[in-house]
C-alpha cells in the first residue's frame, strides 16, 4: 500500500487559507481523511480537490464510525454559505467538485434548500462548466428533499449506504437505515429521469461477511446506483466503533471485480478509498461530458479512454 504524503504544497496552502477566510468546513478535515494532503495538493496531473462540508461542522446524528461533532441543536445555518462556497470554488478554477454536508434533522427540510442553493450558484458562477457531485443526507426519507436536490442541476447524486443490512443499527445512527437509504438513491434516479449518475459507498472491516457485501452491491445495483466505492473502516478515536477486521488488498480487488460484473459504471475499491476520494474523478468526468455530448471521443475510442482512466484511478489507490 502506498504511504500517504503529509499535507503541503502551494495548492494545499491556498485552499486551506481560503477555507479559513470564508469560514468554510471540509469533510476532509472533520472526518480526518487520510487522503487530505494528496487531494488538496493535487500534483501528478490531477486536479486539486477539496470536499466542502455544508451546513456547518456539527451533525444532529451520531454514527458510531464518524468523527464529526454532534449536537441535538447545532448552530443556525449561515445564510452566506452558498455564496461563499460558490465564490471560493469558482476562484479555484476546478472542473469537478464534491459537496457534502452534516445531517440537520432539526431543520424542516433537512437543509435540502440550502444545499440546492449552493449547487445552483456554483453552476451559475461557472456558467455550467463545473461538474458537481453532492453527497447528501437521507432527509429522513422525505422524497421532497431528494427532488429539491435533483432539480438544482447537479451531476452526481451520492448517498452512502455505509454498511451491510445486518450491521446498520450497530454502525449508523438509529435515524438512518438500509431501506431509507436505498429508497433515497432510487428516488434520485427516478426523479432525474435517469439523467443523474448515482453513487454510494460501503465501509469494510465492520464485521460483515463476504456474502453480505455482495448482497449490498446487488441491492445498490437493483436501485439504479451507477458508481460504488469500497474502503477500509478506520477508527477515528477510541470513543468510536472498533475495527473488526483489516480487509486484505486481495479481497478489495475481488469485490471490485464482483461489482464490475454486476454492471456498476465505475468502482473504486481499496483500503484507502473514501467516498469522496479522487479515484473516480477522471472516469466520472469523462462519462458526464460524454452524456452532455461534450469533447470526449465516441464509441470504441471513448471506451478505450475510459478503460485507461479506470486504470489510472485504481493506481492512485494502490
UniProtKB/Swiss-Prot annotation:
Pathway(s) annotated for this protein in UniProt: Protein modification; protein lipoylation via endogenous pathway; protein N(6)-(lipoyl)lysine from octanoyl-[acyl-carrier-protein]: step 2/2
Disulfide bond annotation, renumbered to this chain: none
The keyword Disulfide bond belongs to this UniProt entry's keyword annotation: no
E.C. numbers: 2.8.1.8
Gene Ontology cellular-component annotations: mitochondrion
Region (Disordered): 291-318
Subcellular location field: Mitochondrion
Key word Iron-sulfur present: yes
Example of a GO MF term: 4 iron, 4 sulfur cluster binding
Stretches with biased composition (Low complexity): 302-318
Keywords attached to this entry: 4Fe-4S, Iron, Iron-sulfur, Metal-binding, Mitochondrion, S-adenosyl-L-methionine, Transferase, Transit peptide
Cofactor(s) in the UniProt record: [4Fe-4S] cluster
Residues the record lists as binding [4Fe-4S] cluster 1: 28, 33, 39, 276
Ranges for domain Radical SAM core: 42-265
Catalyzed reactions: [[Fe-S] cluster scaffold protein carrying a second [4Fe-4S](2+) cluster] + N(6)-octanoyl-L-lysyl-[protein] + 2 oxidized [2Fe-2S]-[ferredoxin] + 2 S-adenosyl-L-methionine + 4 H(+) = [[Fe-S] cluster scaffold protein] + N(6)-[(R)-dihydrolipoyl]-L-lysyl-[protein] + 4 Fe(3+) + 2 hydrogen sulfide + 2 5'-deoxyadenosine + 2 L-methionine + 2 reduced [2Fe-2S]-[ferredoxin]
Residues annotated to bind [4Fe-4S] cluster 2: 59, 63, 66
Family: Belongs to the radical SAM superfamily. Lipoyl synthase family.
The protein's name: Lipoyl synthase, mitochondrial
Organism field: Chlamydomonas reinhardtii (Chlamydomonas smithii)
Native organism taxonomy: Eukaryota, Viridiplantae, Chlorophyta, core chlorophytes, Chlorophyceae
Gene coding for it: LIP1
